[in-house]
Amino acid sequence: VGLIVQKFGGTSVADLERIRNVARRVARTRDAGEDIVVVVSAMAGETDRLLEMSRTICKEPSRRETDVLVSTGEQVTSALLALCLQGMGYPAVSLLGHQVRIYTDSNFTTARVQSVDGARLRKELSLGKIVVVAGFQGIDEHGDITTLGRGGSDLTAVAVAAVLGAKLCEIYTDVKGVYTTDPNICPEARKINKISYDEMLEMASLGAKVLQTRSVQFAKKFDVPIHVRSSFSEEEGTMVVVEDRDMERFVVSGITYRMDEGKITIKKVPDTPGIAASIFGPLAEADIVVDMIVQNVSEEGFTDLTFTVPKGAMEQALRIVERTAENLGAKGTTFDEDIAKVSIIGVGMRTQSGVAAKMFAALASEGINIQMISTSQIKISCVIQAKYLELAIRVLHHAFGLGEDTVQQAPPWA
């Protein structure tokens, strides 16, 4: 008998009928002879509803109490699903984060998982029960409830799968898998059958919302195979697994985008050692994540420095940067929130030349100007004007032949 972990997101458990639907699916897996641990999110919209209540009653709610409050969303769905399974004649038990003993740090609302004690899970499984775990939550060393941040139920599922040595972690969502790009923007987008952890990590961190980034990191570290699939269909989804030779045949496997960043430019900064540290140091201290950085070629001892930050941190970043720029004797700062970042991703890029040139030529053919570029071994990102984003995605999807069943492949000898 194998063990499978199944995780169901908010849309999959949005109401009682959908919870019944999930119970039927879990029961089918059980009937096939598998041991099962199910991880559930709160009902769609429930976490936001609870957060709104906390902000209504208190202008700046403490993060500790916020976690106590929002963790109840998953408590409700885990109990309802266990009750539903029991009503169908299946022995089931619901467990909360602290009962499973998912230990985290004390960083309330965005806690990191430190360890999972599998003893209680193994005990319940040995008694023949289907175990339903409340996702998104854990407990710190003081016994306080913590939550794992947006998408945290994915992390719960992968962490539980890792500690129990599950043969598979199935992530059920409202889409049929991981697509070559957003099907709402590009109708030709195709479902990817198999993708490597590294590609999935880039896609998740660059805007693909199917899996939470930390859950993919965790899966890679502990070699947990993930199957992303739809809870509303029987179709096979996308397997996220260790990279194999087969994957390198595809030069580009996906295109992602983000619209949640803005860019800041500091004009005419004195080009001397230590300048970058004095600009980015204060931003790091304020916990502001800087993404892309471009420095112009120095002219007469001065240079322009441009970088992107999350739009939500723009005001704070500008305040810090303007102060720093003044101290450095720079000519001033400008900002632009009307930008988008589009990225192409694929492990085949490691062995294939000309990918960047092809990307830039495709964008140029539609008159799309590239403002910033950043690359890694398996991705190229460009910042462009926001209004061109959808056009850029479609033209790149076409240029790299991602809509065809015979996706452009690197030559077999590459």
Model regions and ranges:
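Nucleotide/pyrophosphate-binding catalytic subdomain
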Residues: V1-V216, I384-Q385, F400, E404, ...
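Conserved dinucleotide-binding and phosphotransfer motif residues
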Residues: A32, M88, F222, A286, ...
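A conserved regulatory-domain signal marking ACT and ACT-like small-molecule sensing domains
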Residues: I57, G237-A414
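Active-site C-terminal subdomain of aminotransferase-like
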Residues: V224-E235, M259
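Short hydrophobic alpha-helical runs that function as membrane-insertion/retention elements
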Residues: L168-Y172, I226-V228, D291, M372
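Acidic-aromatic/histidine active-site loop/patch
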Residues: A219
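Active-site beta-loop-alpha junctions enriched in small/polar residues
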Residues: M43, S231, Q295
